[in-house]
């Protein structure tokens, strides 16, 4: 189902938080939504790989990379792993790389910027902890909705059938 964050904001204005418009879309899917799983790490992606090995149906991986854009936290290999395991999307408060591959994959990917330098492969960081960026605090198990217009957050699953009316 196509997500329209503008319409969701109109319908659920008192229930959603809007993430500051600092992200760009790099994946092949223009919209996505799901329950959040968080990873907090800095310039390393070992924990990201571990989480993406899990079943991702109905889930979005939200990565707090501290806003650093010196090393890419998501590359083609990790994005393909996410697709293979059914993840709906990835949001990176940091950088990504290998855009020519990312844009062909059936997954939504939002990040701050691209850079060709890869991250370290260390398992340093935290999983499923609240993170704050873009003017919003994200809690594990919140729901995130993203399209080319923006990213919104809700503590509860929104009724997407409202979009069809």
Curated annotation (Swiss-Prot):
Q: Which organism is it from?
A: Haemophilus ducreyi (strain 35000HP / ATCC 700724)
In Swiss-Prot or TrEMBL terms, this protein is called: Regulator of ribonuclease activity A
UniProt cross-references to NCBIfam families, sorted A to Z: NOT-MenG, PRK09372.1, RraA_entero
Which SUPFAM superfamilies does this entry report, sorted A to Z?
Answer: RraA-like
Q: Where in the cell is it found?
A: Cytoplasm
Which InterPro entries does the annotation name?
A: RraA, RraA/RraA-like, RraA/RraA-like_sf, RraA_gpbac
Q: Spell out the family assignment given in the record's similarity comment.
A: Belongs to the RraA family.
| Coiled-coil region(s) | none
Record HAMAP family? RraA (MF_00471)
């Amino acid at each position: 189902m196509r997500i329209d964050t503008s319409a969701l904001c109109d319908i659920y204005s008192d229930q959603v938080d809007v993430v500051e418009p600092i992200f760009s879309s790099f994946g092949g899917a223009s919209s996505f939504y799901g329950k959040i799983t968080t990873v907090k790490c800095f310039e390393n992606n070992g924990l990201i790989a571990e989480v993406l090995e899990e079943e991702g149906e109905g889930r979005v991986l939200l990565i707090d990379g501290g806003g650093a854009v010196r090393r890419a936290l998501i590359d083609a290999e990790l994005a393909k792993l996410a697709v293979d395991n059914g993840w709906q999307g990835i949001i990176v408060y940091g950088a990504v790389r290998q855009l020519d591959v990312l844009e062909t994959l059936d997954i939504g990917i939002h990040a701050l910027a691209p850079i060709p330098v890869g991250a370290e492969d260390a398992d340093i960081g935290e999983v499923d902890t609240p993170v704050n960026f873009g003017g919003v605090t994200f809690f594990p198990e919140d729901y995130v909705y993203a399209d080319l217009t923006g990213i919104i957050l809700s503590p509860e699953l929104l009724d997407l059938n409202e979009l069809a009316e």
